[in-house]
Amino acid sequence: MQKAVQLDVFGRVQGVGFRWTTKLVADRLGITGTVSNQPDGSVKIIAMGPDAILEQFIGAVKASPTPSGRVDRVVQTPLQDVSACHKFSVVG
């Protein structure tokens, strides 16, 4: 079953390649959506994919896909009305 979530990721997640390594993980797993830096120093991810694959992706995000980053907290919000994406993009 397809699922969509918003992940708000807090910690050392800007200026360490977090968005680009998140994209690599998403591309490898076939997850679509976006990742962007936020003014408060966090990163926002909108991710869509099959339930089991999305859980793998969320686990990789929580573990920090970049060795120079650090994830302190992830706030996960289920999304209902999301436009379908055909790829995973780094924005902002």
Curated annotation (Swiss-Prot):
Entry annotation: catalytic residues? R19, N37
Q: Which of UniProt's keywords are assigned here?
A: Hydrolase
Catalytic reactions of this protein: an acyl phosphate + H2O = a carboxylate + phosphate + H(+)
Question: Which Gene Ontology MF annotations are present?
Answer: acylphosphatase activity
Q: What is its EC number?
A: 3.6.1.7
InterPro entries attached to this UniProt entry: Acylphosphatase, Acylphosphatase-like_dom, Acylphosphatase-like_dom_sf, Acylphosphatase_CS
Q: Tell me which residues make up the Acylphosphatase-like domain.
A: 4-92
Provide the top EC class. Answer: hydrolase
Could you say which protein family the record assigns here? Belongs to the acylphosphatase family.
User: What is the protein's given name?
Assistant: Acylphosphatase
**What organism, scientifically named, is this protein from?**
Latilactobacillus sakei subsp. sakei (strain 23K)
